[in-house]
């Protein structure tokens, strides 16, 4: 179980709109096969196009708003993400591996934004959280 106080204290400093936009943008650039779920977002042909895309930024914020909800409910991630798991499995048919990839990209973005403040101890705690969220989102697939 992650250290709740450490996670929630740090998370309160995160600018969800900026970090969410960058995390989703990086996911789409670093793992371009994930773009197939976002073809309706328009031009995703280059890194600059992806990172400057208003729909990517807006959806990144939406994703991180949901993640923020998970941070507030670390004891019940499966329940917190049950509806999103159902949506991504049954309707969108998203490969559950993408949840793990996004979690890892999120950790990279947090490290980039917070530098030395994102200590190895904090990273270890966040790895637990992103793994828990990825597992909760993949729950419907099992």
UniProtKB/Swiss-Prot annotation:
Annotated CDD domains: Hb-beta-like
PROSITE patterns, sorted: GLOBIN
Function text: Involved in oxygen transport from the lung to the various peripheral tissues.
Cystine pairs: none
GO biological process, one term: hydrogen peroxide catabolic process
InterPro entries on file: Globin (IPR000971), Globin-like_sf (IPR009050), Globin/Proto (IPR012292), Hemoglobin_b (IPR002337), Hemoglobin_oxygen_transport (IPR050056)
Extra information: This type of beta-C chain is found when anemia has been experimentally produced.
Gene coding for it: HBBC
Tissues of expression: Red blood cells.
Keyword field: Heme, Iron, Metal-binding, Oxygen transport, Transport
Record text on subunit structure and interactions: Heterotetramer of two alpha chains and two beta chains.
Family from the record: Belongs to the globin family.
Gene Ontology MF: a single term: haptoglobin binding
Domain Globin, residue spans: 2-142
Signal peptide (UniProt feature, chain positions): none
Entry keyword Transport: yes
Entry keyword rRNA-binding: no
Protein name: Hemoglobin subunit beta-C
